[in-house]
Amino acid sequence: MMLELNGLHAGLRFSSAHIVFGHPTCGVIHGHSYYVDVKLYGERAGDFKFVCDFKIIKKIVKEICDELDHKLILPKNHEHVYYELRDKTLYFKYENKEYSIPVEDVILLPIPSTTAEDLAIYFANEIADRLKNLGFSNINWIEVSINEGIGQGACYRKYLEVK
């Protein structure tokens, strides 16, 4: 059975800035008002025969959104971006451009870029880990869509081990 959350209507949103390093137009700091759609597919389980209680999955997704909200999102695993942390300031460099920003205004994610595609993978992995930590073992897959606005987004499906 499938459970579905529409991020636009469920309030699963965050506003962040990012840079797609090397891209001709998106390679400058710019922002989006993102919303996150989530689908879970799995077996019904527990006393109430839920795939997952809506309150639980909404709380998980909202927590991740809140971690990214009003931050500059940067890719920790980009092979050509160099980072240095000094005195509560993050310095970073890509090609001939150098930046500095207070560390509390930035979040470094373990992804190679900050595209909607890589953010979808990040969200799916985070949701999977958090559900696993809560003891969920009945979910076959998680699908996450990261929407940069109405009508454009990227979707990723992560398959899980069911026990």
UniProtKB/Swiss-Prot annotation:
SUPFAM superfamilies: Tetrahydrobiopterin biosynthesis enzymes-like (SSF55620). It comes from the Archaea. The active site is at 26 (proton acceptor), 70 (charge relay system), 148 (charge relay system). The keyword Transferase does not apply. Its EC number is 4.1.2.50. GO terms for molecular function: 6-carboxytetrahydropterin synthase activity; metal ion binding. Gene3D superfamilies: 6-pyruvoyl tetrahydropterin synthase/QueD (3.30.479.10). Disulfide bonds: none annotated. Pfam families: PTPS (PF01242). This is Putative 6-carboxy-5,6,7,8-tetrahydropterin synthase. The gene is queD.
